[in-house]
């Protein structure tokens, strides 16, 4: 019986992978060799990376290629929408590289992709994991106005390490502002652990995220992609993750994922449903 289940899972994985390949689009799930890909795809969740695979920024923890990005594919919105339908997904995460070369940082393209996905798949829950759009409030609002259900933007690390870890065009304060601009939508952010932060700094960052209304928090271990990226300063054990999870819930987060291999999209649908229940119970957005 177990072997039959494994065969069915593998056949389904190959089918979904083939659809992505035929559409000529990218999923973070495959590109980043995500360890959670089987679980996520099996539960109807996938993360699409739009606007190419070359980033205009050079964050020191990230393995994504840096340089001059490709031209936008104006067929991408419909390609992603069709892939969502053919893959039978019910929760979609749309993310991208930074596109500082574009006047609006890619906000219009994000909006077009979300609208296309929603139009073709009206029951699908859509989460966007966005760049900071240079801290531009109107661009953040433009993306949210396209009909997203979850707005995610990662602060990535604690305040003191931000200049070391992230590109100079990013800042801790700017990321908090971006999250504060998102209104009437579930909000999510992530913190990478093991870059040299203290427990007190992690808790301070949690508090800062709650102060700008973040509902869902993801805590995960930083894993060095290659020798070109920053070294891992510490590997957290499960007891430490449990303690951080406990602290996060005490601060008022609706849902917390605290696991070494967690990614922003891990258990995304479950987190969204919990956050929405919290919103309704507390009459928020009314």
Curated annotation (Swiss-Prot):
Membrane-spanning parts: none
InterPro entries in alphabetical order: Aldolase_TIM, Elp3/MiaA/NifB-like_rSAM, Lipoyl_synth, rSAM
Keyword Ribonucleoprotein recorded: no
Residues noted as binding [4Fe-4S] cluster 1 in the record, renumbered to the chain: 29, 34, 40, 265
Listed name of the protein: Lipoyl synthase
Family: Belongs to the radical SAM superfamily. Lipoyl synthase family.
Gene Ontology molecular function terms on file: 4 iron, 4 sulfur cluster binding; lipoate synthase activity; metal ion binding
Enzyme Commission number, as recorded: 2.8.1.8
Binding note for cofactor: Binds 2 [4Fe-4S] clusters per subunit. One cluster is coordinated with 3 cysteines and an exchangeable S-adenosyl-L-methionine.
Metal-binding is among the record's keywords: yes
Keywords annotated in UniProt: 4Fe-4S, Cytoplasm, Iron, Iron-sulfur, Metal-binding, S-adenosyl-L-methionine, Transferase
Cofactor field: [4Fe-4S] cluster
Top class in the EC scheme: transferase
Reaction catalyzed: [[Fe-S] cluster scaffold protein carrying a second [4Fe-4S](2+) cluster] + N(6)-octanoyl-L-lysyl-[protein] + 2 oxidized [2Fe-2S]-[ferredoxin] + 2 S-adenosyl-L-methionine + 4 H(+) = [[Fe-S] cluster scaffold protein] + N(6)-[(R)-dihydrolipoyl]-L-lysyl-[protein] + 4 Fe(3+) + 2 hydrogen sulfide + 2 5'-deoxyadenosine + 2 L-methionine + 2 reduced [2Fe-2S]-[ferredoxin]
SMART domains: Elp3
Major location (coarse): cytoplasm
Pathway: Protein modification; protein lipoylation via endogenous pathway; protein N(6)-(lipoyl)lysine from octanoyl-[acyl-carrier-protein]: step 2/2
Annotated organism of origin: Sulfolobus acidocaldarius (strain ATCC 33909 / DSM 639 / JCM 8929 / NBRC 15157 / NCIMB 11770)
CDD domains: Radical_SAM
Domain Radical SAM core: 41-254
Residues the entry annotates as binding [4Fe-4S] cluster 2: 55, 59, 62
Cellular component terms per the entry's GO annotation: cytoplasm
Organismal lineage: Archaea, Thermoproteota, Thermoprotei, Sulfolobales, Sulfolobaceae
Cell location: Cytoplasm
């Amino acid at each position: 019986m177990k072997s039959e289940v494994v065969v069915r899972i593998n056949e389904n994985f190959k089918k979904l992978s083939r659809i992505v390949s035929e559409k000529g689009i990218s999923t973070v799930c495959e590109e980043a060799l995500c360890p959670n890909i089987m679980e996520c795809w099996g539960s109807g969740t996938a993360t699409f990376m739009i606007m190419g695979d070359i980033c205009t920024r050079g964050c020191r923890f990230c393995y994504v290629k840096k340089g001059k990005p490709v031209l936008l594919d104006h067929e991408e919105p419909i390609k992603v929408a069709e892939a969502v339908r053919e893959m039978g997904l019910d929760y979609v995460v749309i993310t991208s590289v930074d596109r500082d070369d574009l006047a609006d940082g890619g906000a219009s393209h994000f909006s077009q992709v979300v609208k296309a996905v929603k139009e073709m798949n009206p029951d699908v829950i859509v989460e966007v994991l966005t760049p900071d759009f240079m801290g531009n409030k109107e661009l953040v609002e433009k993306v949210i106005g396209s009909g997203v259900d979850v707005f995610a933007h990662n602060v990535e690390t604690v305040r003191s390490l931000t200049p070391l870890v992230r590109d100079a065009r990013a800042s801790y304060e700017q990321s908090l502002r971006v999250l504060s601009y998102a209104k009437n939508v579930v909000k999510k952010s992530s913190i990478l652990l093991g870059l040299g932060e203290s427990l007190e700094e992690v808790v301070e960052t949690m508090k800062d995220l709650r102060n700008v209304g973040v509902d869902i928090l993801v805590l995960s271990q930083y894993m060095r992609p290659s020798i070109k990226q920053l070294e891992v300063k510490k590997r957290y054990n499960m007891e430490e993750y449990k303690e951080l999870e406990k602290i996060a819930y005490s601060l008022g987060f609706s849902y917390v994922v605290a696991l070494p291999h967690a990614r922003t999209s891990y258990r995304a649908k479950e987190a969204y449903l919990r956050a929405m229940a919290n919103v309704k119970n507390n009459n928020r957005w009314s």
